[in-house]
A protein has these predicted regions:
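Switch II (G3) loop of P-loop NTPases
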Residues: 48-50, 65-81
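A structural signal for isolated positions on well-ordered beta-strands in alpha/beta enzyme cores
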Residues: 45, 70, 122-123
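P-loop NTPase switch/communication element
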Residues: 52-64
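Walker A (P-loop) phosphate-binding motif
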Residues: 5-42
């Protein structure tokens, strides 16, 4: 993970948690990533964009003063999803094992890579 912080620019690294399918662990991963980075001494902003509001993280300040901004998105795709992807440095796509999540995952990948062709993303199987 440390390579994410060696950008050579004075801008925050934006980590986007995204998947069209709800209930796959986006919010839990977002909370844990933010807390883990804070415990390591990084200044972290947290964007709770999910209207369900399930995140436990209390810092909602997103700006370039942070080393990292962690953005938790809702479990649906919208025009805003593309905007989030345009401004992201990496996207994390949590998925659950099984076939039900494949189509939403593929649609998510299509939306974020069309919005930001250079976006790196990781698919994390969560159960």
């Amino acid at each position: 993970m440390t390579m994410l912080f060696q950008k050579g620019e004075d801008m925050a690294t934006n980590i986007l948690l995204v998947n069209q399918k709800g209930g796959v662990g986006k919010t839990t991963f977002a909370d844990e990533i933010a807390w883990g980075l804070e415990r390591r001494g990084h200044k972290v902003g947290f964007g709770n964009l999910d209207p369900q509001g399930g995140a436990n993280h209390e810092k909602d300040l997103l700006d370039d003063e942070n080393a990292v901004n962690v953005i938790d998105t809702p479990g649906f795709l919208s025009d805003e999803t593309a905007t989030y992807a345009k401004n992201a440095d990496i996207a994390i796509i949590p998925v659950q094992p099984g076939t039900l999540g494949l189509k939403p995952m593929k649609r998510t990948i299509k939306v974020i890579t069309e919005a930001n062709p250079d976006l790196s993303f990781a698919i994390i199987v969560n159960n």
